[in-house]
């Protein structure tokens, strides 16, 4: 048999093998088309598990009469026109295969009307013929698609369908998934004439929690932790199962730009985040990741169930850090394991003891939010400020934005963390201990001033009033050397060595009182060696003196603060190397100063900056640096020139 082009009907049926796996696949493709059309209400009608009838009705923009027949053709779509569109796709559909594939294995009727049309039109296609008949019809603005007798012309595929109940369960499960990410849409689902699901629009958080309860169950919704995290072009939001919950759940939903995907990356990040917190092997979650569409490829799976991130490691670490932070916030804000006394008398005693005393919780130093963050955050204690550095001690907090939430939930605690993340412990139906939680006080003026002072720590090369050097800067040779002329001597002074010396001197001076650490907007996580906890404890004073904030959590070293001299360094490489050196001996202050200076030389922007710093040194220090200049044998050169 020679090579030949397949007939369109056969090609569509082959494509249908990938696109149309079962009735739930048809519902998925058609509902996603309705969402792309801007529908706000979608009604789904199913008969006999979808094998007899699948009917989707929406109030979207509709399809013009001239495009009805074209819509049932292969690779016909309105959602992209170039490769650039494909690389930044945000719509659900984009290949133009669904309607053609579905119509090739069923009897399909598409009725639609646009707002510009005075009447609706209906297109009909049946199986192998693929001939589209268009006729007038009555229909409001929007579209209705009826798929009758699925797989009627492919008996082998029809035999592989399960029972009506099983097939409808798959449809119901898919609708749950899309209902969680599209809370603004009103969905209804009918099976054999009976309304099974009615998801009303969720335009605010209480309404969304009602939908979450419908989908994931009341216990998950009541105990779930809210996650809200923004960093550059990444935004993670959603809900996590309580780490102390012992209830098994199959709520494992992850969305990328509104698209439900299965991704081992997020599963690994969730398991790693819960490694030492949760009592369940696979915690439940509903997480939604918004990312620049150019940074993710959605065109790697026939059914679009998988995506590929261009920076998968970065996305993994981002999700991991956000979840770990939310879990830690939940623990620090008093979201504890529910305690249920066995007898009414014990319950009364517990209630009295909780109402008579306020719980106090000790917190470690923490990572503050970036100045750009819009989330209000407050804390209990005022910071202690001295002339050398500002230190802020973290305590539980309640800000203006969180008091509204706290008023409707017993656990009075919503804390913003380093990632802009909020962990919101939700009320448990069986317990009321949260009502007796102590509310944090508003911050004092001193605390607010200290907070601002810490976040606005100036960079090492920024000065309020630029220093005007008294000495004129020498000529520069080859962009690397200063040419020094003194009496009868000419010498070359490497600019790089001057930069290193001036920076080392500056750092060594500040080390005496301690460097001010600057919070990282996105803390860095590194796999920790077994002896690092002991190293951090042994050299705690030195680490504080350097302005570093390092913690060990879940066998990971978390870098939260660094001095300004390390902000532009590769922290994942520099910090481990420094910790390795601590195994042998603690470095002297001058050695530390040189090490920090070497990491921060990119801070100088020009030779003029370096010369200005050089001129501020004492004369003795300047002379020590100048002594390192390389003398030029200019006299011998002149003599050789004269001989020639």
Curated annotation (Swiss-Prot):
It comes from the Bacteria. One of its GO terms (molecular function) is ATP hydrolysis activity. GO terms for biological process: mismatch repair. The keyword DNA damage applies. This protein is involved in the repair of mismatches in DNA. It is required for dam-dependent methyl-directed DNA mismatch repair. May act as a 'molecular matchmaker', a protein that promotes the formation of a stable complex between two or more DNA-binding proteins in an ATP-dependent manner without itself being part of a final effector complex. It holds the Pfam family HATPase_c_3. Residues 373-400 have a biased composition (Basic and acidic residues). Gene3D superfamilies: 3.30.230.10, Histidine kinase-like ATPase, C-terminal domain, MutL, C-terminal domain, regulatory subdomain. The lineage of its organism: Bacteria, Pseudomonadati, Pseudomonadota, Gammaproteobacteria, Alteromonadales. InterPro entries: DNA_mismatch_repair_CS, DNA_mismatch_repair_MutL, DNA_mismatch_S5_2-like, HATPase_C_sf, MutL/Mlh/PMS, MutL/Mlh/Pms-like, MutL_C, MutL_C_regsub. One of its GO terms (cellular component) is mismatch repair complex. The keyword DNA damage applies. Transmembrane segments: none annotated. This is DNA mismatch repair protein MutL.
């Amino acid at each position: 048999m020679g090579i030949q082009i397949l007939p369109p009907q056969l090609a569509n049926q082959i494509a249908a093998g990938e696109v149309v796996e079962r009735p739930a696949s048809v519902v998925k493709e058609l509902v996603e088309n309705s969402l792309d059309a801007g529908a706000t209400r979608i009604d789904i009608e199913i008969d006999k598990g979808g094998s007899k009838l699948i009917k989707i009705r929406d109030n979207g923009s509709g399809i013009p009469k001239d495009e009805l027949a074209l819509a049932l053709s292969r690779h016909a779509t309105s959602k992209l026109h170039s490769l650039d569109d494909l690389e930044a796709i945000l719509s659900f559909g984009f290949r133009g295969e669904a309607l053609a594939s579905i119509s090739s294995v069923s009897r399909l009727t598409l009725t639609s009307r646009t707002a510009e049309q005075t009447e609706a039109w209906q297109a009909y296609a049946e199986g192998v013929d693929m001939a589209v008949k268009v006729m007038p019809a009555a229909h409001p603005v929007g579209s209705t698609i009826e798929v009758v007798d699925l797989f009627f012309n492919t008996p082998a595929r029809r035999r592989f369908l399960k029972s009506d109940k099983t097939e409808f369960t798959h449809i119901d499960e898919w609708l749950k998934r899309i209902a969680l990410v599209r809370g603004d849409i009103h969905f209804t689902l009918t099976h054999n004439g009976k309304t099974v699901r009615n998801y009303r629009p969720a335009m605010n958080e209480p309404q969304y929690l009602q939908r979450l309860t419908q989908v994931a169950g009341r216990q998950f919704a009541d105990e779930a932790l809210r996650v809200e995290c923004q960093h550059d072009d990444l935004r993670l939001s959603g809900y996590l199962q309580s780490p102390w919950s012992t209830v098994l759940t199959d709520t494992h939903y992850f969305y990328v730009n509104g698209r439900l995907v299965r991704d081992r990356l997020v599963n690994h990040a969730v398991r790693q985040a819960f490694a030492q917190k949760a009592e369940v092997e696979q915690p439940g979650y509903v997480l939604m990741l918004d990312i620049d569409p150019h940074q993710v490829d959605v065109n790697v799976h026939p059914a679009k169930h998988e995506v590929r991130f261009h920076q998968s490691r970065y996305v993994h670490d981002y999700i991991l850090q956000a979840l770990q932070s939310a879990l830690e916030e939940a623990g620090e804000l008093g979201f504890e394991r529910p305690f249920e006394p066995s007898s009414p008398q014990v319950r009364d005693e517990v209630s009295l003891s909780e109402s008579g005393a306020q719980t106090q919780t000790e917190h470690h130093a923490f990572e503050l939010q970036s100045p750009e963050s819009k989330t209000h955050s407050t804390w209990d204690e005022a910071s202690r400020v001295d002339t050398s550095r500002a230190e802020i001690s973290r305590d539980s907090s309640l800000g203006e934005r969180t008091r509204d939430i706290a008023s409707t939930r017993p656990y009075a605690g919503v804390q913003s963390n380093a990632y802009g993340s909020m962990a919101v412990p939700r009320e448990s139906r069986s317990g009321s201990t949260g009502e007796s939680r102590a509310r944090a006080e508003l911050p004092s003026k001193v605390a607010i001033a200290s907070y601002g002072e810490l976040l606005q720590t100036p960079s090492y090369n920024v000065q309020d009033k630029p220093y005007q050097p008294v000495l004129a800067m020498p000529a520069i040779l080859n962009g690397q050397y200063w040419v020094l002329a003194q009496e009868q001597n000419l010498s070359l002074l490497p600019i790089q060595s001057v930069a290193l010396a001036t920076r080392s001197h500056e750092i060594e001076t500040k080390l005496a009182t301690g460097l001010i650490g600057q919070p990282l907007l996105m803390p860095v996580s590194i796999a920790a060696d077994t002896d690092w906890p002991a190293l951090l404890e042994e050299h705690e004073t030195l680490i504080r003196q350097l302005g570093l904030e390092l913690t060990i959590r879940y066998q990971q070293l978390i870098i939260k603060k660094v001095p300004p001299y390390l902000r532009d360094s590769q922290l994942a490489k520099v910090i481990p190397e420094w910790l390795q050196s601590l195994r042998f001996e603690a470095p002297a202050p001058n050695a530390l100063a040189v090490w920090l200076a070497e990491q921060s030389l990119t801070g100088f922007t020009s030779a003029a900056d370096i010369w200005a710093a050089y001129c501020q040194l004492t004369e003795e220090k300047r002379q020590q640096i100048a002594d390192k200049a390389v003398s030029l044998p200019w006299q011998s050169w002149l003599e050789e020139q004269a001989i020639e």
